[in-house]
């Protein structure tokens, strides 16, 4: 949903959990006692999260072509480390036309439109809850913040956008996806330079018990917000009808630099803010911490036991064959997959890079790879950043990248247990090292995500 619209190509996925505890014979998994898991066991997460990612990709027509999995726990010096708060990172690659990559400024009278599904009590407070330690809120609040997916609806909306993007002239002025904060976040960012008036009664409601706050702020998935000229509304409606995508004209662009939700039937205004109050200069966040020099015990091993160690290492989910992740799904859905996880006559998941063609005839494409080094980062956060970048680059070199390093962009994703003593300082070291290393290589980092609350609390 960048600029005036873009086209998704393929998905990626990373799963990180604590040890799966598949059986009693895995001695390394007994270093920490098994916890009373709050919602799902690690093995359930590994199975069900991957099922969901694969199923979504198949239904949407966006193949899952690369990924990674890691399980880890460590107990030393009264510090318990592990992915009890699990990571399921869903990413992806796509492309857009250069001339459509910049959002245009809306004009007064332009129409504010929503493509996609209706509002439900889903994803309430998702941004706040995802930024809090798991267990900090009641289970009801945490479960209420969980998003749900609807690939069929997303495909319909995406196809409507594709129809505009692939036209000779794309009439979309600006487009934005719905994420945390729902309509409040998405629609306000569309009109942050001008102002907008949203008719609360025109917002599609699937649950009649929703309050105004829930209608405005829910994170029901598979919706896009966009601005389009009034004269071009019929064109978008025809394309949406062809793709069977629900479409709603919910408001107008104004020039009063206010963002307002108003019910035309009751006259109520549950929200009416000046844009400067929403997008003005926010106070800088100051993170105060101290550096703690953590030392870890030297590895205690015997050369006589190397065959045993090897057998154990080969059983780790991060090392063992990943066919349980790949062989349950069509990895070539859509017909543009040039390289996915599996290779050879046995289709073993050994490829380091995923590649998608841009069309069915040409030889232009997009490559993607993944790198991470959380264990190295425990010992040295700066080294961990460099190793993660190095791993991603050593994985992607198997694709003939146009313009070499200048043709590569990074997405930096930080999952960190901030506010624990010493962790903010370690994060600073890691981010600075990542920035310095990328600059030295001449690689840009245009995007990324942070989850700075990777801490699990138990009752």
What annotation goes with each model-predicted range?
Residues 1-459:
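Glycine/proline-enriched, intrinsically flexible loops and inter-domain linkers
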